[in-house]
Amino acid sequence: MNMKQKSVYQQTKALLCKNFLKKWRMKRESLLEWGLSILLGLCIALFSSSMRNVQFPGMAPQNLGRVDKFNSSSLMVVYTPISNLTQQIMNKTALAPLLKGTSVIGAPNKTHMDEILLENLPYAMGIIFNETFSYKLIFFQGYNSPLWKEDFSAHCWDGYGEFSCTLTKYWNRGFVALQTAINTAIIEITTNHPVMEELMSVTAITMKTLPFITKNLLHNEMFILFFLLHFSPLVYFISLNVTKERKKSKNLMKMMGLQDSAFWLSWGLIYAGFIFIISIFVTIIITFTQIIVMTGFMVIFILFFLYGLSLVALVFLMSVLLKKAVLTNLVVFLLTLFWGCLGFTVFYEQLPSSLEWILNICSPFAFTTGMIQIIKLDYNLNGVIFPDPSGDSYTMIATFSMLLLDGLIYLLLALYFDKILPYGDERHYSPLFFLNSSSCFQHQRTNAKVIEKEIDAEHPSDDYFEPVAPEFQGKEAIRIRNVKKEYKGKSGKVEALKGLLFDIYEGQITAILGHSGAGKSSLLNILNGLSVPTEGSVTIYNKNLSEMQDLEEIRKITGVCPQFNVQFDILTVKENLSLFAKIKGIHLKEVEQEVQRILLELDMQNIQDNLAKHLSEGQKRKLTFGITILGDPQILLLDEPTTGLDPFSRDQVWSLLRERRADHVILFSTQSMDEADILADRKVIMSNGRLKCAGSSMFLKRRWGLGYHLSLHRNEICNPEQITSFITHHIPDAKLKTENKEKLVYTLPLERTNTFPDLFSDLDKCSDQGVTGYDISMSTLNEVFMKLEGQSTIEQDFEQVEMIRDSESLNEMELAHSSFSEMQTAVSDMGLWRMQVFAMARLRFLKLKRQTKVLLTLLLVFGIAIFPLIVENIMYAMLNEKIDWEFKNELYFLSPGQLPQEPRTSLLIINNTESNIEDFIKSLKHQNILLEVDDFENRNGTDGLSYNGAIIVSGKQKDYRFSVVCNTKRLHCFPILMNIISNGLLQMFNHTQHIRIESSPFPLSHIGLWTGLPDGSFFLFLVLCSISPYITMGSISDYKKNAKSQLWISGLYTSAYWCGQALVDVSFFILILLLMYLIFYIENMQYLLITSQIVFALVIVTPGYAASLVFFIYMISFIFRKRRKNSGLWSFYFFFASTIMFSITLINHFDLSILITTMVLVPSYTLLGFKTFLEVRDQEHYREFPEANFELSATDFLVCFIPYFQTLLFVFVLRCMELKCGKKRMRKDPVFRISPQSRDAKPNPEEPIDEDEDIQTERIRTATALTTSILDEKPVIIASCLHKEYAGQKKSCFSKRKKKIAARNISFCVQEGEILGLLGPNGAGKSSSIRMISGITKPTAGEVELKGCSSVLGHLGYCPQENVLWPMLTLREHLEVYAAVKGLRKADARLAIARLVSAFKLHEQLNVPVQKLTAGITRKLCFVLSLLGNSPVLLLDEPSTGIDPTGQQQMWQAIQAVVKNTERGVLLTTHNLAEAEALCDRVAIMVSGRLRCIGSIQHLKNKLGKDYILELKVKETSQVTLVHTEILKLFPQAAGQERYSSLLTYKLPVADVYPLSQTFHKLEAVKHNFNLEEYSLSQCTLEKVFLELSKEQEVGNFDEEIDTTMRWKLLPHSDEP
């Protein structure tokens, strides 16, 4: 066994190189990835430049003077409620000297008081009495009192040379003065002791203020939020890339030996590099703009770098848990926002250390706490430095450690869940796998009792299973024992495999056959280790696949080719091979040699430097096969390996597999019975999860009663009854299967070959009975399969595939077709246009309704838009709540016995009297305050920054005077200390009550608070007006999947497509705008005055704005239709452009001319500009007429129509662009109509050289048909001198583009009732030809006529090569949309759809979304859509690809029913030559863009295929040499094709075969003399003819500018619909 050593380092390096190349080559995505992060950094820099970040130099203690120095003459005091006690208190309060001249008003209730206060802003103050000793003061916050309890931005400032602090507002603007007056009144009324002098003489002193860095309000919070989300763009792309690759490629790479750690490391390392660079960038911005001043570069960089790494690991974890990129992004964003914002609690509160450590497990929380540590130290002019004598910096090491630990935890969890939570039903580990050294899988245990009962023998010898040849006994490589597989479906368990029991042998090629859903792929998934059997066991070379260790060993020698292509599109062919070679563990020194070997064997040297995304589907399939055979694995598991390959490439693959047959185990599944017949030594046929039969082709054909097909060519005098009697005379059990005007086809049993010599001898004498000739062919494996499936067989026309119709199915097909002829005339002109508009509107609505991703994105963007508005309201609510607080002592001061707790301290009492102040001390202790008493001689209290406040007591006993000293950081210190003194005096007068004072916010519904965010309403307008690209760029997807082309070919008017889309998009956008208006109104309704004229103006402008923006985006979508959709990027452009336009108008002071100009030039800004326009006009009107309501003038109403002029302009531009790309479709369009133009066929640049005589005849016939004026004589399809050139890629900037020619002067026509097959290898020009005929691309030269008309519209049914379907729509919805597009009336459409569904057995799939249908059903749907309507022309581009034989039979019958006895013509391209033989009246073979031959199949065989194929199977291997010698003796020119074991194959020239009677006589003698088991003789097939012609394309021999088309890239679509 060829074992290879897998190195994690080698795999990681290879994947890292792949990721780097991906980033380098996908420049737009990488630019977006980097650009958004850089742009966010620049926004931070811009935001920082608008903020003043100034170092406050410090301030000496300040004496603010006495309380009664306040001048209150401008104040108004309003109180409530009015009672005797409150009046008494307020009367006494008014006597205070500081309130002299102050107006004191009583209000009966709070509502009335609020009205008075609002009318007298900002100098009115309110008082609400709760009881005698409790009241609430209402001041204008921010002016008379601070906004917050704490302030980390700037508690002191330098106001033009005068230092001031926030807490002094209480003292200087009347709050403490009014508090003191009220407290004095309460104490005097309660105790009858005068305290006016004691309280009014209180002086205020601020402690000294140390230097610090001043910042604007919420400056720190906003920057932390910016930094927290700075890596969000990167997170988006990480989740997108990782989720996509994990879903698409990771499991396949694991089958090749990829280690999980290598996958995650490769992505982790490249994004670690990105994080490293972006962290440097953002750190430079932070230090350069001095957002943080004192902390060094390296500390900030490490914090950001570790935080970014932890986010990468978090994305890995969430992508494993959630599996979808959209959900991953949303969840990571919300977790980052939530955990990060939770960290703000550390800013304002001191959390318990244990809780803080636990929360640090969330990396955003750890990052936020780290930033807060830096900011707090920066605030006090300290930085994070090492070594740090104070020890404050060392907490940052803990933060670094936690971020590093978080990243490791997330990464380990990602690796763990990656093993136990796979996609779907794939193999996965047990949750406790790490406890078991063997790493057992979940579900690996099978039913032990079953295993014990298993027998060693594969199957007893019976009629269904051919006995294994003796030479293979003991070579059992794969042993499958009682394997069952169940899947969980919605309706319960579904059994995919039902007790399979058979062996696969080394040295044999084994094919697994079966209809779609038979269980082939399920079995292969079990064999390649992707899935685990529900029951039973599988061993490969005696290693059990259920054991992880065994599976790893098997994977080292196994190559797997799945149904889908596995290449990385962004890598070249050579790079793909090199990458997978390294993943497979091929030694680095041997990688290049191995890659070159594969390129040579698959003939891909000339495309080795082409990117995989530019390859044709066939070339991609060859690349996938090449990846599979890298390293020459001993076991090959191939799931439909040749799907999409042309016969020549398929023959190459077959040859490679035959060469590897010896000492290898090759198992493949296929839908092609011919492939199995030719390639496989042993066929295993499955049905509904069970094994039906197994054996060689000859065994299966003999067992199921199928033998030879004898075709007799007849003329007019031939009597079928006489000929049938003649045949049955020689072979009684012969059966007449097909009878038509040209021939009779009989089935002859295989065991009757001994009678063939006499039969053919007599046939040679039957020319007088009307038999002009005969030929014989073997039955195909396809017929065996159809018989096993219980269906009627389709035998090959002429000598291989004569259609044997199942009458019931055929009747259904003919009934379905007849429904079209029974219909009324289809709707046309404006009626059809309206029907199509509504059909497109319905289509758009259904897509929008089911695009969960788009709706979630819209919801997220809407949430982002409304976020500032919510934040504003929350902040206002918090502001109201925070200011409405009680001035409690415990806010700043500790209680006795309480442990020190930030920010509380003890209260310092300084005795400046010459006596004992024990009475005052005692009164303070009653207030539960921890006191510290000292003498004034020791300290004056102004330098003690370790205290929040101090009271200096002076005077003499019983007549104290007080000074209050406050730390400038404690904003509410003065009211609290004044209350402490007041309550102390109460206690000294033996009163036990305490005065309680609260502060309440001023009764404003909207507070003018700048938070650093845009105004919420403005931001809402800005974002929602930029949201439109998410809604309206669906046409790009339609273009890319060619759905738009298909709709146009089906008869859709171009204007109907856009108008139908707009009908839904505009309506949806209007709904969003109305919702925005509603939110805006609810937010501002208390102070927003809306007149009927403003409402009318909005009613006018809103639909116009929605329409203009929608058609503007349609125009953009059309221009960039070949690129990615990038809705988010366009939304950002709209947002940015609107912001710039608003800034321009703002700078120009909202000049109306500039405002209107910006509205016209930038469609996305029009609505926001109109809102601004209304506001400016309202202000102008108010200045002129203060009392009158604002009314719009006639000029103002003209501005409302700007969006409508824009809409008309964009519709016109869109029409012009459509006109440029395709004039034909516009000629009948009722809206975009243009005048009919004469056909302008360009002369062909090439003249035909050395053409076959049949091609020349067809060219003359086509030219004649083109010029004839008799419509009845015109063919259905005329393709005259078609030539197509594409511009190739430049090799360098200065070189010219070389032309690539897809079609070279081809001419042919299709008559009514005829099916013409267009054959050729990949790249021969078939699809280009059919695209020219369909009108998708414009010919470089030549012309096309369909049913006598050059326009395609309404004349064509087209089944393209790819599935042009909408994944989220159901099968029924597709049929209904296309029926409406083709103009079928509702009743006719229902009838036609019902009959087609019945004919193709699609009832169960009617309401299933396309994305959940099998590949075969989706292909059927494409074909059925082409049949809808009564189109006289059908173009079918490989219609049966991927469909099982049963489905193919239905399709073939449908095609024949469509053409039979009708005026329709069909042009068919196919790689399935049996399909061509079954259906086509004529075939044309294209090679390198030219027609090489054309004619009936038998004509081509007679002309080009001169050989017969002889197969002999001997019973004893010892006879092989003798038989070979005898055959060469009997047939001297026989060429040995293949010798394998007991099977011999030869090619015999016609000269050696004719007459057939003598040939069969010789073969019967050989069979008798050498005891042959069986033999077969058949004429050369169409495939042999095709392969011979295809060699011309392989050899090349063309002009220099043309590559051999086998090596062409997929040609670009230059002329789109």
UniProtKB/Swiss-Prot annotation:
Topology of this chain in the membrane: Multi-pass membrane protein
GO terms (BP aspect): lipid transport
Glycan-bearing residues: 84, 109, 940
SUPFAM superfamilies (alphabetical): P-loop containing nucleoside triphosphate hydrolases
UniProt keyword list: ATP-binding, Glycoprotein, Golgi apparatus, Membrane, Nucleotide-binding, Repeat, Translocase, Transmembrane, Transmembrane helix, Transport
Gene3D superfamilies in alphabetical order: P-loop containing nucleotide triphosphate hydrolases
Known tissue expression: Widely expressed with higher expression in liver.
Example of a GO cellular component annotation carried by this entry: Golgi membrane
Family matches, as PANTHER family: ATP-BINDING CASSETTE SUB-FAMILY A MEMBER 6 (PTHR19229:SF13), ATP-BINDING CASSETTE TRANSPORTER SUBFAMILY A ABCA (PTHR19229)
Summary of the function given for this chain in its UniProt record: Probable transporter which may play a role in macrophage lipid transport and homeostasis.
Annotated protein name in UniProt: ATP-binding cassette sub-family A member 6
Provenance organism: Homo sapiens (Human)
Lineage of the organism: Eukaryota, Metazoa, Chordata, Craniata, Vertebrata
